[in-house]
């Protein structure tokens, strides 16, 4: 083998090792964000819901601070139920990694019939949460709170 070929092979191996250490990201987070934007007609950016109260964002504990935070708690619970479904219980098929089919028409969200059992369940979790977000007041004081003292 030529030295140049060895260098290319080494570079590819190093790149693959680096890629293996990148944490997996939820694939349907983008879809959920689009559902939120559909339901609220783009009035509030999706990232405003990523660090709100005790349940909106990563994790969740304690008592929800308001109705919007309860929407997030319900969404977390819904994902927990999805993880118990046999159809959602195989590698990369759970609520955070499974994508689904849906439609948005003038703020109305519809989960499509071509979703399998797991995708349909997850889609309905996201749809219900997005509708809840759209109808519930947003309190700026509950964004980026100290969850250790407030939850």
Curated annotation (Swiss-Prot):
Metal-binding found in the keyword field: yes
Keyword annotations: Calcium, Disulfide bond, Hydrolase, Lipid degradation, Lipid metabolism, Metal-binding, Secreted, Signal, Toxin
An example molecular function term from Gene Ontology annotations: toxin activity
GO biological process entries: arachidonate secretion; fatty acid biosynthetic process; lipid catabolic process; phospholipid metabolic process; positive regulation of fibroblast proliferation
Reaction catalysis annotation: a 1,2-diacyl-sn-glycero-3-phosphocholine + H2O = a 1-acyl-sn-glycero-3-phosphocholine + a fatty acid + H(+)
Record localization: Secreted
Disulfide pattern: 38-104, 54-151, 56-72, 71-132, 78-125, 88-118, 111-123
Cofactor note: Binds 1 Ca(2+) ion.
One GO cellular component term noted in the UniProt record for this chain: extracellular region
Active site per the UniProt annotation: 75, 126
Binding-site positions, Ca(2+): 55, 57, 59, 76
Signal peptide limits: 1-27
Tissue: Expressed by the venom gland.
EC main group: hydrolase
Names of required cofactors: Ca(2+)
Stored PROSITE patterns: PA2_ASP, PA2_HIS
UniProt-listed Enzyme Commission number(s): 3.1.1.4
Residue stretches in coiled coil: none
Family that this chain belongs to: Belongs to the phospholipase A2 family. Group I subfamily. D49 sub-subfamily.
Its job: PLA2 catalyzes the calcium-dependent hydrolysis of the 2-acyl groups in 3-sn-phosphoglycerides.
Protein name: Acidic phospholipase A2 5
Source organism of this protein record: Tropidechis carinatus
């Amino acid at each position: 083998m030529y030295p140049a070929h060895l260098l290319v092979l080494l570079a590819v191996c190093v790149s693959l090792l680096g890629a293996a250490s990148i944490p997996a990201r939820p694939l349907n987070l983008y879809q959920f964000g689009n559902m939120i934007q559909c339901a609220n007609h783009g009035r509030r950016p999706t990232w405003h819901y990523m660090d709100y109260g005790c349940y909106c964002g990563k994790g969740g504990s304690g008592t929800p601070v308001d109705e919007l935070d309860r929407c997030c708690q319900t969404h977390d619970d819904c994902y927990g139920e999805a993880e118990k479904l046999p159809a959602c219980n195989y590698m990369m098929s759970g609520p955070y990694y499974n994508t689904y089919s849906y439609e948005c028409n003038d703020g109305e969200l519809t989960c499509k019939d071509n979703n399998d059992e797991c995708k349909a369940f997850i889609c309905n979790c996201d749809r219900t949460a997005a509708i809840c977000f759209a109808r519930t007041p947003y309190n700026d004081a509950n964004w980026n709170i100290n969850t250790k003292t407030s939850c």
